[in-house]
Amino acid sequence: MQFAVKENKGEKVMENNRASFGSNLGFLMAAVGSAVGLGNIWGFPYKMGMSGGFAFLLVYLVLAVLVGLAVMIGELTIGRKTGLSPVAAYRKLSKKFTWMGYMAVLVPFLVLCFYFVLGGMVMRYALGYLTAIFGWNTWNVADISEFFGTFILNGGQMILWTAIFIALNAFIVAAGVAEGIEKFCKIGMPALFIMLLIVIVYVAVQPGAMDGYKFMFGWNVEPLKEDFLKVLKTAAGQMFFSLSLGMGAMITYGSYLKKQESIQKNAVIIVICDTLVAIMAGMIVMPACYAFLGGETSSGPGLLFLSMQIVFDKMGYVGNIMGFLFYALVFIAAISSSFSLLEVITSFKVDQNVAEGKAPGRKKYAILAAVIVFVFCLPTCLDGLGAGTNGGATIGSPADILGMHWAEAGDISEFADGTNYYVKGDDGIYSKVDTAAVAFDASETYYLNTAKTWNVDWLDFYDMLSEGIMMPLGAMVMAFAIGWIWKIDMVVEECEASGHKFWGKTFFDICYKFITPIGMAFVLYAQITSYFG
């Protein structure tokens, strides 16, 4: 690493000339910022709503302790021990696992292909409420509930706000570890917690809010009895997405962590803070849904945008203030996570340059990475999140490209009850048949929509590849390697290099050897069967 060149004024470097955080507080704020993101404030509440409330929370907490903490410690250890980003780090530990490093770079790339789009949407919503506070209506719709559907089908607006959000990310990453990432997170994370508390207190005093708390915290394990694997895979996917595990982010941030800092203590704080924010977000969304939406908590990803917008609209003028605070904190959470993922991609090229004796080129590669991801964001911007007119998905969806969207109904003599039939127009658009009003026509060719939940739009496609398959696969292989190949002593040695005694060696050894690999194998099985079964 002797070729590293300090490009940014004020950038902190370690003894090996690698950039580092200026303080442990800076590292913690950045790592918590990476972990706390849309996964907490968008994913956690809607997945809890769709998975039975308390049952989901219970499984999530167990996984966070038995799997999340172990994987977090493992990734931070690999990063600090090697002082390198994922590809170079895994190659240094064992060339056989170099593919793991490449996967750890591919995952954040895939995640950013939809994460940047959602981040841009959050910015637009925050601006809408900010201007509404001062009496300016920038929603441009007669009924505020119509804005979501209008916005996601406006490709130009989606691209514009995505581009703005990406530009902010590129600026922060180009500024460097200490001058960009650390400075933002030191301000952003405390601000996020303050805004969370303000909105929580306001929602808590609304009539009906108590029912939302009962849904979250009232003992109910019936969903586990009905479909345990479904709840398990949903909670596991959420945990990895929320904690930024399996994305290379914690390996990259760990490589910037100074030797005197405690890996275990930092890992525990990160997991606790991340889980706390997720629960706090649930304490906003769930009670609000019961107070203003009659307890409708399972509206999926639209919960963050459509449902919460309706909630704030019903609050009257104060809803503009609460709406701005809510989407401002979501913005902070989103950008602190997204630039950590862009940093993974950027550091891959920076480390490669340094190893070849070249200047790091951080600014150039941060901008280049942002531009490349932007190109792959375009399908997500343009497909209306699957809300087009082509049988529920726009032309050009993954299902269309893969030839998995439409199939002829075959030789049928009548409409089957409970089945949706479509006819193909001359323009190539499939229209749903109103079987209650239209008589069966034997001369007509009817089609069935065979698209899956993971290929009906680009967001779900990117999510399936990253969160659904690669993240649990990466955690499973990494845990297996630590437990059986590199051994727990590698983790203990690196953690104790800071002068802090490693606690729970036997517990973590069992986690790495058995609990995490076996648990992730079950999750992978559940994910793959749900996607392709």
What are these regions (language model features)?
Residues 3-42, 71-76, 80-92, 98-99, ...:
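Membrane-interface "cap" regions at the ends of multi-pass membrane proteins
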Residues 15-21, 182, 186-339, 350-368:
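Membrane-embedded translocation segments of transport machinery
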Residues 15-18, 47-51, 84-103, 116-174, ...:
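Inter-helical loop and helix-membrane interface segments of multi-pass membrane transporters/permeases
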Residues 23-61, 248-249, 254, 265-268, ...:
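Transmembrane helix-boundary motif of multi-pass solute transporters/channels
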Residues 26, 34, 159-160, 273-279, ...:
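Loop-to-transmembrane helix boundary motifs in multi-pass membrane proteins
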Residues 68-87, 97-147, 331-350, 472, ...:
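Hydrophobic transmembrane alpha-helices that form the core helical bundles
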Residues 346, 353, 357-370, 406-410, ...:
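C-terminal membrane-solvent junction of multi-pass transporters and transport-like membrane proteins
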